[in-house]
Amino acid sequence: MRNSVQSDLKYINIINISETLYLFYSTGLDTLEYIDSTYKNFIIMYVNQHLLYGTTLKYLSVGEFFINSLTIFINGIRETMTSSTVIMYAIFGMFIFSEIMVFSTFIWGFFHFRLSNPVMIIEVNLEAFLQISDVLNAGSILISLILQRIEERGYFEVDYMLERLILIGFIFLSFQGDEYSLVKSYINNHWVTLYFNVLTGLHSLHVYVGGIFALMQAFASENCGCQKDEDFNAGMYWHFVEIIWIALTMLLFLL
């Protein structure tokens, strides 16, 4: 086994040296420096530390090698495309992705417990549910109009719509607070009330954050003019909140 490992390592070293010499003589010193900083150093680390190549896990080690090479390639492309706009979209995208993961965790927990208890009677206040949904739907329609005005460069109406969006957000939070005050059970009475309060509480928190975003954009629109990218990001955040509410509606009120 040890002799097989050593022979494989020597074979990898021979390939590495041959490729390095060929690129050195054909392209010059810059290519050699690039190889020394990326590919060659990784090969040396792989040979010295990753001895799985000579065992039954040979293909696993080779797969890991190609995954690391692909990662280096992707990072090289990402570094060439780095700009302030790309960084902003990356941060905003990762924030949305993290929020999706948080909600998915609690939604899956509720879905799991609900399927484990198929026979269960839950009293649903449809009037309060419809009021909250109508308010949030009005906010979603208003966001769509804001994004349309931004695309049409109708910036004079954006400030007015953002102020109305802030008002809609506070109305939604008021209705949600009334619903909490009328609930007759506490958060630790049953798993249904636990998930109901946690999920709707997280959603209300995101509506509050969306209202802060709208307030900041309204202030910036009054002082600095309309900022297309920032308004678009705030609008997409509100659409994300609307999608989450649709998922909560199916789980908490219709399932």
Swiss-Prot record:
Transmembrane segments: 12-29, 57-77, 91-111, 126-146, 155-175, 196-216, 235-255
Protein's cellular compartments: Mitochondrion inner membrane
Enzyme class: translocase
Statement: the UniProt record of this protein carries the keyword Transmembrane: yes
Main location: mitochondrion
PANTHER family: CYTOCHROME C OXIDASE SUBUNIT 3 (PTHR11403:SF7), CYTOCHROME C OXIDASE SUBUNIT III (PTHR11403)
Family recorded in the similarity comment: Belongs to the cytochrome c oxidase subunit 3 family.
Function: Component of the cytochrome c oxidase, the last enzyme in the mitochondrial electron transport chain which drives oxidative phosphorylation. The respiratory chain contains 3 multisubunit complexes succinate dehydrogenase (complex II, CII), ubiquinol-cytochrome c oxidoreductase (cytochrome b-c1 complex, complex III, CIII) and cytochrome c oxidase (complex IV, CIV), that cooperate to transfer electrons derived from NADH and succinate to molecular oxygen, creating an electrochemical gradient over the inner membrane that drives transmembrane transport and the ATP synthase.
Subunit structure: Component of the cytochrome c oxidase (complex IV, CIV), a multisubunit enzyme composed of a catalytic core of 3 subunits and several supernumerary subunits. The complex exists as a monomer or a dimer and forms supercomplexes (SCs) in the inner mitochondrial membrane with ubiquinol-cytochrome c oxidoreductase (cytochrome b-c1 complex, complex III, CIII).
Protein name: Cytochrome c oxidase subunit 3
Species for this entry: Theileria annulata
